Amino acid sequence: LQRTNRIKHALSLYRYHEEGKSQFDKSGVRPPSEVDLEVFHRWVKESVALHRQSKAFWKEAVDMLGRDALARVKYEDFIDEAGKVETMERLAGFLDINGLSYAASVFKKATPDSLEAAVVNFDELADRYRGTKFAKFLTE
């Protein structure tokens, strides 16, 4: 399972490690974060490093097992219930499992999917990454 949006992944890492907030919580959405931009940038770099490691692992797995033996699942596939159901159906087909049922989770996503809603100082964050390779992640 991998997240494609580096900024949102970094925010998840930041909230967990710097604020002690879990991504999912039974109590639901938590207040937005005011991020320290320097600390946040360290988590952006960590997200990039983790992404590189994941890509290297995926390449080795494909080389070893072949592409047909693997199914890639992205975090973004699980954002909403429709995506979860579709992904579970795809995985059931991949695994050749009939009658797989899916029950909605009791956990609610703790961080809003919109960066503007999740970060108090979003404008500062956007200014920091505008014009960089991360700019595209600000609006996804």
Label each residue range with its predicted role.
Residues 1-60, 64-70, 78-101:
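PAPS-dependent sulfotransferase catalytic domain
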Residues 104-140:
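C-terminal accessory extensions appended to soluble enzyme cores
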